């Protein structure tokens, strides 16, 4: 008897999810992909980018990123939680909590927002050894909050702000790891 009730609940859930009028207000998922060649060894790239404190080095000053928790160890690990304040809009402080969910040393790691300014944030950091250095790829999937209003915010300023952050990071990487080092 209970399994029938459970089965009916699943059928109801499936029907409701497919024909839910609230789906009209569900926001879009956006994707940002950035690739950069770095003329250093895979070991050197991993050593730098897998240290959470270096996030502050790679973040534009106007965001005023400040860690609010103690970071344990020098290298990230699955389950590591980082909390920080950023000021992305009009200098207004926002709390952000991310978790490192996956780490494959010298290949990739993933951070996901647990609480913060986005409805969803999933950021993959990939490293591939190539001739003369490393190809670093960032792949971000994100959703803005507030449904269609969030989609409007993405088109008006969030997308441009993320692009600007990665322009800054590209220049910072070129400054930290110049071609003639």
Predicted regions and their residues:
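Short, surface-exposed coil-to-beta transition loops
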Residues: 31-33, 93-97, 119-123
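Hydrophobic ligand-binding cavity/cleft-lining segments
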Residues: 23-77
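A short, structured loop/turn motif at beta-sheet edges
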Residues: 42, 101-108, 126-135
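Beta-strand/loop substructures that line and gate deep hydrophobic ligand-binding cavities in soluble
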Residues: 113-164
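Glycine-rich portal/gate segments that line the openings of hydrophobic small-molecule binding cavities
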Residues: 67-115, 168-171, 175, 180-181
